[in-house]
Swiss-Prot record:
Keyword Translocase: no
PANTHER family: LD18447P (PTHR43804:SF7)
Alphabetical keyword list: Cytoplasm, Methylation, Protein biosynthesis
The record's account of how the chain is modified after translation: Methylated by PrmC. Methylation increases the termination efficiency of RF1.
Encoding gene (name): prfA
Protein name: Peptide chain release factor 1
Length: 357
């Protein structure tokens, strides 16, 4: 077993401490702290459970070997227990492999149109709907924070917040973190009169959302905050007050807009959360070469040559070029049936992490 005993001892102690804290009513007077503790407990529970099963199986194996020394009828039981111990040992090693520290986090997701004009914007809207439907299948909450629509109702740019409702160790980020990159579509555009298949692209950016804005250092003096009237599809005004908020982080030039909440105060709070997520991602890029390489796989410019996935409508085929995944159920995928693809991406990521360990 590759993990050191001290690591297990530390995790067992942390698990016991969290169990004690979660039984304390005072903790639940602070919902954010309770949720954070609950998520960590959910992360540790299967590890602790597997470790205890392994210890019990080892004791049973030792007993069976002692009995088999005097009675051959126990030989088969020894073989079964040896197999179980090996299986649990491997399972525990997998659980202790390096894990993304943001896996339990919620996300901010941006879709942007690129090459292809109106068709690209329509495809960007298709991607946004795909993610919304996937989130709905999992009981997650989706909020459209900002949207810039095209003449035909597509998305030039849209920002979504996707949040889970439970304390699962595998949160929204663990499932959707691989979506960042350029997505290419091959189909006959609605604007095409000759029936020819065109290729266009849209981009997706995904950021883990911090539990609290305070977790990310943001100096108020570094912010320029502008307010304006919210607008609906096609640029039509839907609010007679200046409730929309645009925040510019002057040192980095990052701009975040939020206009879909009901009040200026709510829009400002959500915009700050999105800004915190983006600044956190930038800080991690600078701090870690690995994180920088991962983020490099996301879009810098929406260029078809940087594609991570192709959606081929004539063949009803989806292809993820990073892992060679192919499936002929594009219609179902666009309706939010993404679990098979996400499972394959997660398995490839897990294998990579085990190799690093």
């Amino acid at each position: 077993m590759t993990q050191p005993v001290q690591t297990i001892d530390v995790l067992l102690a942390e698990h016991a401490d969290l169990e004690r804290r979660l039984s304390d009513p005072d903790l639940h007077s602070n919902p954010d702290e309770a949720r954070k503790a609950g998520r960590r407990f959910a992360r540790l529970a299967p590890i602790v459970g597997t470790y205890r099963k392994l210890m019990a199986a080892r004791e049973d194996l030792e007993t069976a070997r002692e009995l088999a020394a005097d009675d051959d009828s126990f030989t088969a039981e020894v073989a079964d227990l040896e197999s179980r111990v090996a299986q649990l040992d491997t399972q525990l090693t997998d659980m202790l492999a390096p894990r993304d520290s943001h896996d339990a986090d919620d996300i901010v997701l941006e879709v942007k149109s690129g090459e292809g004009g109106e068709e690209s914007a329509l495809f960007a809207a298709d991607l946004a709907r795909m993610y919304i439907r996937y989130a709905e299948r999992h009981g997650w909450t989706v909020t459209v924070l900002d949207e810039i629509t095209s003449d035909l109702g597509g998305y030039k740019d849209a920002t979504l917040s996707i949040r889970s409702k439970g304390d699962s160790a595998d949160g929204v980020w663990s499932r959707m973190k691989f979506e960042g990159g350029v997505h290419r579509v091959q189909r006959v555009p609605v604007t095409e009169s000759q029936g020819r298949v065109h290729t266009s692209a849209a981009g997706v950016l995904v950021y883990p959302e911090p539990e609290e804005v305070a977790e990310v250092q943001i100096d108020e003096s570094d912010l320029r905050i502008d307010v304006f009237r919210s607008s609906g599809k096609g640029g039509q005004g839907v609010n007679t007050t200046d409730s929309a908020v645009r925040i510019t982080h002057l040192p980095t030039g990052v701009v975040v807009t939020c206009q879909n909440e009901r009040s200026q105060l709510q829009n400002k709070a959500r915009a700050l959360q999105v800004l915190a997520a983006r600044l956190q991602a930038m800080a991690e890029e600078q701090a870690s070469a690995e994180a920088s390489a991962d983020r490099a796989s996301q879009i810098r410019t929406v260029d078809r040559s940087e594609r991570i996935r192709t959606y081929n409508f004539p063949e009803n085929r989806i292809t993820d070029h990073r892992i060679g995944f192919k499936a002929h159920n594009l219609d179902q995928v666009l309706d939010g049936d993404l679990d098979a693809l996400f499972d394959a991406l997660a398995a490839a990521d897990k294998q990579s992490r085990l190799q690093q360990a």
